[in-house]
Amino acid sequence: MLALHTWTLDSTSLPDVLRITRAAGWDGVELRRVDFARAAEKGQAAAEVLRLVKASGLRVACVGVEMGWMFADDSERRRLLEAFAESCRWAAELECSTVMSASDRGRGDLARASANVREAGDIAAAHRVKLAIEFNSQAEQLNNLDVMRGVVTRAAHPSCGLLLDTYHLGRSGATLSAIDDVALAEIAYVQYSDVPRTGLEPGKALDRLPPGRGSVPFKEIFELLDRKGYRGFMSYEAPNPAAWARPADEVAREALEATRACLPAAR
């Protein structure tokens, strides 16, 4: 199942993103917390966003949460976990089984991160959703598969798993064998986009491309996931100002065509 992440069409309004995503043939959509925040800035309640998404007829693959809670403590931790619970409620109302969080960008205590993951897992479980946690290749500490896998493994919560993002896997130098070493039970969700072959800049990640345009071995990765038995959504998350400047319907169609060209024949 293939979903389009709303960040991919960031310069397009949410109603148009939903219409374009469905018309292009995607199976679902991934929502961000900022989609709700932008609506609130226009005086629209979260309930209105939920009605809009439900009316689109699209399945919701995942709902993003506010990041920063992994190393947080005291009042900021409480605030972020309250926001986390709110995103879980939205996901549940949309009949979406997954919420995702990017890793914290700075540095902190890994034991605290695992403890906070366990608490977040309890919140997710209470809403009957699963938390998928992503490492960010451009973060200071939680920037590779090994370290994030360690945090999640130490948390040992059945409602928490890894989010594998091909862009961050590629930028961090993860090998196919390292990805293959991750058991199916550890994988909660998948996001994907390609990494440019040249021109990469440390700390910058708004250069993502459709499959086949860069250095990620998509056919091998998709085959690997298929062989493992992963049958959840794979979400195309490709923020790129060059794409935002183009007609959104073209971006959505081209990305889906590029993705399908890399999928195993059975998919």
Locate each region found by the language model.
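Active-site-proximal loop/turn and secondary-structure-junction residues that shape catalytic pockets
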Residues: 8-10, 33-35, 66-69, 103-107, ...
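Active-site acidic/histidine proton-transfer and metal-coordination neighborhood
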Residues: 15-16, 52-55, 59, 70-161, ...
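Glycine-rich, proline-tolerant flexible connector loops at the mouths of alpha/beta enzymes
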Residues: 30-54, 103-107
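Metal-dependent catalytic neighborhoods of phosphoester/phosphodiester hydrolases
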Residues: 39-46, 73-78, 110-111, 245
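N-terminal small/glycine-rich loop or linker at the start of catalytic domains
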Residues: 1-5, 60-71, 201
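Histidine-acidic metal/acid-base catalytic patches
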Residues: 1-3, 10-25, 50, 56, ...
